[in-house]
A protein has these predicted regions:
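Short, well-ordered beta-strand elements within core beta-sheets of diverse protein domains
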Residues: 21-28, 112, 255-258, 342-353, ...
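N-terminal Rossmann-like NAD(P)+-binding subdomain of aldehyde/semialdehyde dehydrogenases
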Residues: 1-102, 130, 272, 484
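Flexible, glycine/charged-enriched surface loops at secondary-structure junctions
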Residues: 28-33, 167-171, 244-250, 276-287, ...
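Short, flexible turn/loop "capping" segments at secondary-structure junctions
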Residues: 16-18, 215-217, 246-250, 335-342, ...
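ALDH superfamily catalytic-core signature
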Residues: 6-7, 125, 203-332
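Rossmann-like NAD(P) dinucleotide-binding subdomain of oxidoreductase/dehydrogenase enzymes
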Residues: 89-233
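Conserved C-terminal structural/oligomerization subdomain of aldehyde/semialdehyde dehydrogenase
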Residues: 2, 315-485
Length: 485
């Protein structure tokens, strides 16, 4: 008799984790040369399959643009591998002769990796590379709407890894997805660490297991455009960034905060790039379409082109429209469009001066993107530094596309598709998660100085009262109590 879906999912999780643990016991003894050979081969194979996997991801999920998913797959393979290939993850990885410290890498074990529907194959490629480079095993749990493409990406990398000497079972991917199966994966006794990329409920579940977990927070990313900015460049960047893969990367700009002296010019230039500024009635239609009564986003609108959204909402726009822009004046529950919008809809706020712009950005971050990211366009270094010092976020991308800058494609940040939101955002780190986060470091610490003399002198023994003394005290107390009565 066939198992029901939940039981089949639980059993699959158990089998994959057990196989991964057995494989990890072998892989943990691999040399640096073996690790790097396997990872390089996987990165090359994934890069070569980027177009096919991108097309599969778009067709299966219905989100985004296949050509942009291809670029994300190339980033997850080429850029991520280039950033970690020279990192030592085996044996002695560091020496400090002055402090007499020797550092030794130690793998964590089995990584339970939860992946989203918005960036499915690219996240699979990235997580496998950073885990295997750290000498970990990995078992992936894809989003239910992206199982086929994720399994294809994981299978490709597993086959290449095994062909280059990695043990069978080192890389696993669930196909029978259920809440119960995912919970079994995260809570399994052999799971060492959880790497969760996805919605807030999933990340909270990962943090509630009692296991070490790297999770992400929501990214309600504001972009401040200062009067000192190169406005023509900014207009190109904002529209291109928001339209990239139909805004499915969590670091995508969610609201423009425009310094008033350049606001009209910026709006005009963005229109020339394909931005359509909605009327108030059209904005109302989008509010109703994009968000459910409970405030959650309508998943049918995620990752959709602007022309599709307008049609769903019930109004017409030019066929060459890339982004819908809604002018807003409030932030909070009473303004749904001030939330994160993983689709081609962008908020717009006017601000008179960088101080007011700073305040508005903080409002947006506190409402839905604490710890995540912020974008600033300015040529005034004092304004840029003021934003860096005051904003409760851990990535501030300067004069670049938010989508590509925050993940490390166009900046010096570590290339990553899991972006920590720090303590203020409910994460353990504000880093772009990479292979460093998936192995521990042991330290040999040699004596630098002799211990203080007082630490070597035997202390006088401290003798407590004996049994007879205690009995006498108790008897005396009891007698006093009886006298009072």
């Amino acid at each position: 008799m066939a198992l029901d879906k939940d039981l089949a999912s639980i059993q699959e999780a158990r089998e994959l984790v057990s196989a991964a643990y057995s494989a990890w016991q072998l892989w943990s003894k691999a040399s640096q040369e073996q690790v790097d050979r396997v990872c390089a081969a996987m990165a090359e194979a994934a890069f070569g399959a980027a177009e096919r996997l991108g097309r599969m991801a778009q067709e299966e999920t219905g989100y985004g643009v296949a050509a942009h998913k291809k670029l994300k797959n190339e980033f997850a393979s080429r850029n991520v591998w280039e950033s970690i290939k020279d990192i030592k993850t085996v044996g002695v990885i560091g020496r400090d002769d002055a402090r007499k410290i020797i550092e030794i890498a130690w793998p964590m074990g089995v990584v339970a990796a939860l992946t989203p529907s918005t960036n499915p194959t690219s996240t699979v490629i990235y997580k496998i590379l950073i885990a295997v480079k750290a000498r970990d095993a990995i078992v992936l749990a894809p989003h239910p709407s992206a199982v086929r493409c994720c399994y294809e990406a994981a299978s490709l990398m597993a086959q290449v890894a095994e062909a280059n000497g990695a043990p069978h079972g080192l890389i696993g991917c669930m196909q029978n997805i259920s809440l119960q199966g995912t919970n079994e994966l995260m809570n399994h006794k052999y799971t060492a660490v959880i790497l969760a990329t996805g919605g807030t409920p999933m990340v909270r579940a990962a943090h509630s297991t009692g296991k070490p977990a790297y999770g992400v927070g929501p990214g309600n990313v504001p972009v401040y455009v200062d009067r000192s900015a190169d406005v023509e460049k900014v207009a190109r960047y904002i529209v291109a960034s928001k339209a990239f893969d139909c805004s499915t990367i969590c670091a995508t700009e969610q609201a423009v905060v425009a310094d008033m002296p350049i606001g009209n010019r910026l709006a005009q230039l963005m229109q020339e790039q394909g931005a359509y500024f909605t009327s108030e009635s059209e904005s109302d239609l989008l509010r109703t379409l994009l968000f459910n009564p409970d405030g959650g986003m309508n998943t049918a609108t995620v990752g959709k082109p602007a022309i599709t959204l307008a049609g769903m909402a019930g109004f017409s726009i030019p066929n060459d429209t890339r982004v819908l822009v809604c002018r807003l004046n409030r932030v909070g529950k009473e303004e749904p469009l001030s939330r994160e919008k993983l689709t081609t809809v962008l908020g717009w706020y006017d601000a008179n001066g960088w101080e007011k712009g700073c305040e508005r950005c903080i409002e947006l971050i506190q409402f839905g993107g604490r710890g995540h990211s912020l974008i600033i366009h300015a040529r005034d270094d004092q304004v840029i530094m003021a934003f860096g010092l005051e904003k409760p976020v851990f990535r501030i991308a300067v004069n670049t596309m938010g989508t590509l800058g925050a993940i490390g494609m166009t900046t010096g940040l570590m290339p990553a598709l899991t972006l920590g939101a720090g303590g203020v955002g409910g994460s353990i780190t504000g880093d772009n998660i990479t292979t460093y986060h998936l192995f521990n470091v042991k330290r040999l610490a040699y004596e630098l100085s002799a211990p203080p003399a007082a630490a070597l002198i035997p202390g006088e023994p401290v003798a407590g009262p004996g049994a007879r003394e205690i009995e006498a005290v108790v008897r005396s107390v009891v007698e006093e109590i009886l006298k009072i009565r």
